[in-house]
Amino acid sequence: MSDRTANPLNRLIGTWELQARSQGRFLGRARATFEWIEDGAFVVENAEDVPSGDTDPGWAEHSPMPVRAILGFDDTIGRQAMLYSDARGVFRIYAMTLTDEAWTIWRDAPGFNQRFIGTFADGADTIAGRWETSEDGQDWTPDFDLVYRRADRMT
């Protein structure tokens, strides 16, 4: 895509501080960087743990970090896709939409549906969302909350 400014993925470009929580309990911190690759054809996400003394031991033991993802945009239907991989050897293909208000990621897989619904706030410098799982795609259970805060605009 020659005009990156028209691509919704442009909203993610930069560095973000991440915090994960589950049932009100702090799990851990990470840092994610979203960058254009292949002359603006795709966005790559690289996320790494940020070690801290308050990381939940269970989270640290099963952390997906580092995470790598490639995001792309279908300009004919206005939808995006994410190819995801992590340190646990997990590989997923997610469908995705990114609007001015929300970032939604989902995967329909028999017995293990997943979705993330995040909303933009603070002039799009914060994304507050939740990962959920479902066995049947109907009844959803919270997995963990995830907040992205733009780090490259912090003062």
Predicted regions and their residues:
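Hydrophobic small-molecule pocket/channel-lining residues, especially in calycin-type beta-barrels
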Residues: 1-155
